[in-house]
Amino acid sequence: MKLLVIGSGGREHALAWKLAHSRRVSEIIVAPGNAGTATETKCRNAPVKVTDLDGLLALAQREAVNITVVGPEVPLVAGIVDCFRAAGMRIFGPTAAAAQLEGSKAYAKDFLARHGIPTARYAVHTNVDAAISDVRQQGAPIVIKADGLAAGKGVIVAMTVTEAEAAIRDMLSGNAFGHAGARVVIEEYLDGEEASFISMVDGTHALPMATSQDHKRVSDGDIGPNTGGMGAYSPAPIITDEIHARVMREIVNPTVTGMIADGTPFMGFLYAGLMIDVHGAPKVIEFNVRFGDPETQPMMMRLQSDLLDLIEAALNGDLDKVQAQWDPRPSLGVVMAARPYPKAPITGEIISGLDALPANVKVFHAGTALDAAGCVVTAGGRVLCVTALGSNVSEAQRHAYAGVASLHWANAFQRSDIGWRAIMREHTVTLNVHGPV
């Protein structure tokens, strides 16, 4: 079977890598791909941009692709699933209408409110003065979100009213996010711990994937601006069995039935970004309509089932008949980025050490390319995700950072504390069992 994976990030490298494990897969085309997918077993790249829907469809038809899997949100919101389906091509992902769950934060908040799904209080504004008046009335901390797609960087957690006002002006007047910032969502600040809850959905049924937790802020200690994600681990210990059942009952299943009721049934990967409060009550912070990045990388390290089997079950409406099997060991991924990300990064620098990695480490490429001499060079802000399994999160972290230590380029940087919340929990459990040391 021949597959097409659309995208060029670490998520797409991880999806292609896992799909290549299927005995039924003969070849995977990754469009446009990166230096990692260019050399991955069974994979080859095709130089077609994710925004070129006609070009991607022509590629799939020319190559007689059996199934297409879409990685990033941009082509989904643009309607690539509608485009492929109209041409009779099998593709896994939501329609443009269903993808508005991520494409518009205002749409998502209205959907949540309409269907009684727990989320933060909110208001939507297009006028600067009205938005600022709202913020002054509510006070800080408060959350300001650009309505549209902003590559994971359109959320400002303002700790002061002054900071909130500046964010509003940047989005509505300063054009900081272009059309994506033409509307803003002002949200109640929620206390608690975040987690990523991703499910496969076939339109009617939802199959939960492994839980995970990412690290949005650029610097250690969860400080600095938001990024697309600086690392992740799976599973997320905050999601206990009880909370897992509650998320399915109160959030995931009502979302699936709500989309059906609204006439926009959802098929694809449904990502619920959650805040879990001290009482274990989950609320939706955001929806994404695709696998998370970098959550995909540690999740694919743990997935023991054939991913193609799961995707085919979803396409056939049979997710209620399958289960996903997971390695019980945790996995952790550390993103290596290029300075000064999340600002425009320095690119074109040769990466060394890729041929000398520890055996228990897998490196998923994101912002990489091959230069004229065949060397792997930096080509984006988030460059690599160094991923490893371990008997616990502490061990997975040690393995991943051992891999990081063997990789080098001039302007590389990474956080040094990926997994800190889970590791703190492990240490607490050890102290409770053995007493103070």
UniProtKB/Swiss-Prot annotation:
Keyword Nucleotide-binding among UniProt keywords: yes
Cofactor field: Mg(2+); Mn(2+)
Record EC number: 6.3.4.13
Any coiled-coil regions, as ranges: none
Binding site for ATP: 135-196
GO BP field: 'de novo' IMP biosynthetic process; purine nucleobase biosynthetic process
Pathway the protein takes part in: Purine metabolism; IMP biosynthesis via de novo pathway; N(1)-(5-phospho-D-ribosyl)glycinamide from 5-phospho-alpha-D-ribose 1-diphosphate: step 2/2
Keywords noted in UniProt: ATP-binding, Ligase, Magnesium, Manganese, Metal-binding, Nucleotide-binding, Purine biosynthesis
Cofactor binding annotation: Binds 1 Mg(2+) or Mn(2+) ion per subunit.
An annotated Gene Ontology molecular function: phosphoribosylamine-glycine ligase activity
Binding site for Mg(2+): 286, 288
Residues annotated as domain ATP-grasp: 109-316
Reaction catalysed by this enzyme: 5-phospho-beta-D-ribosylamine + glycine + ATP = N(1)-(5-phospho-beta-D-ribosyl)glycinamide + ADP + phosphate + H(+)
HAMAP family noted in UniProt: GARS (MF_00138)
Family: Belongs to the GARS family.
NCBIfam families reported for this sequence: purD
Stated name of the protein: Phosphoribosylamine--glycine ligase
Organism listed in the record: Xylella fastidiosa (strain 9a5c)
Upper lineage: Bacteria, Pseudomonadati, Pseudomonadota, Gammaproteobacteria, Lysobacterales
